[in-house]
Amino acid sequence: MVKRNLILAFESSCDETSVSVIEDGHRVLSNIVATQIASHQRFGGVVPEVASRHHIEQITKCTKEALEQAGVSYQDLTAVAVTYGPGLVGSLLIGVTAAKTIAWAHQLPLVPVNHMAGHLYAARFVSDFTYPMLGLLVSGGHTELVYMKEEHDYQIIGETRDDAAGEAYDKVGRVMGINYPAGKTVDQWAAKGHDTFHFPRAMEKEDNFDFSFSGLKSAFINTVHNADQRGEVLDKYDLAASFQQSVVDVLVAKTIRALDEFPVKQLILAGGVAANQGLRKQLSAGLQAKHPEVQLLQAPLKYCGDNAAMIGAAGYVNYLHGDRADGSLNAVPGLSFAHLKEEN
């Protein structure tokens, strides 16, 4: 009988406490997620101290539930994987401490995982990867184009120079009176409206793969503020549609341009904003028109947000490549793919 590789994975980089058991890098045996959205809504965003406290309250319970749901014990495990960055330092420390404790107590290998690599590997639950490939990572904290020449190899070829796309969604949502997190509601409203305001598409035509969303955010806020000053009521659906169209146009244009320069076999769309239906549809259409030879892998909706299943998938790859940490592993809130290159 072939031995199963079972990874117990921890994710606590922001405001979701998640523990998962993954078999052989692609089969989800359990994925427990304790969300904190209700606790942060009244603040209009994530409060680090509140997030850390919730992680402390939930981590043991989530671990027990993940093992029970998977039908495994600590003795069955192959390794323990954990997000050690990027993210909120207090939140990261809870997951890192839990993972280190379990790995030490049960004499298991401890595998460090970059949170953003985890988002990429969420697409592994859809299909095996074929290299070289390109990843469009769009989340609340990051917007990046990542080129993967081979497994376990990451090169950032484009990234945001200011706000991440998801961050802009939440700030725009706040102006429109939408509860945090705003992305899903903005997407739903956008589907009912039209691009009547024609907000700027920053850097869309520039000969690089970088992004910028701060100017769009400012233009949106100014439009709403000026209308308020005049006592004018703007159509919320058209506002949402105009904002989203600007974001999506830039994301798709930059991705297609990257594919022109970096021939790949697959394109991954991942991260929290990857759940956006407008982005999914336009990227799929753009790919079909310009690069039909490239297979689009979209992370399943339930694995677009922060979760430990994706950390287990990435952790399995890291485990096979010999990535190990010891008791000195610490949270690295500013971790980037560049760090991984230096370490390897």
Swiss-Prot record:
One Pfam family of this chain: TsaD
Gene3D superfamilies: 3.30.420.40
InterPro entries documented for this protein: ATPase_NBD, Gcp-like_dom, KAE1/TsaD, Peptidase_M22_CS, TsaD
Catalytic activity: L-threonylcarbamoyladenylate + adenosine(37) in tRNA = N(6)-L-threonylcarbamoyladenosine(37) in tRNA + AMP + H(+)
Main location: cytoplasm
Broadest EC class assigned to this enzyme: transferase
EC identifiers of the protein: 2.3.1.234
Cellular localization per UniProt: Cytoplasm
Cofactor(s) this protein cannot do without: Fe(2+)
Alphabetized UniProt keyword annotations: Acyltransferase, Cytoplasm, Iron, Metal-binding, Transferase, tRNA processing
Binding site for substrate: 137-141, 170, 183, 187, 276
CDD domains for this protein: ASKHA_NBD_TsaD_bac (cd24133)
Binding site for Fe cation: 115, 119, 306
Free-text function comment from the UniProt entry: Required for the formation of a threonylcarbamoyl group on adenosine at position 37 (t(6)A37) in tRNAs that read codons beginning with adenine. Is involved in the transfer of the threonylcarbamoyl moiety of threonylcarbamoyl-AMP (TC-AMP) to the N6 group of A37, together with TsaE and TsaB. TsaD likely plays a direct catalytic role in this reaction.
HAMAP family: TsaD (MF_01445)
Protein name, as recorded: tRNA N6-adenosine threonylcarbamoyltransferase
Provenance organism: Limosilactobacillus fermentum (strain NBRC 3956 / LMG 18251)
Lineage: Bacteria, Bacillati, Bacillota, Bacilli, Lactobacillales
Gene (UniProt): tsaD
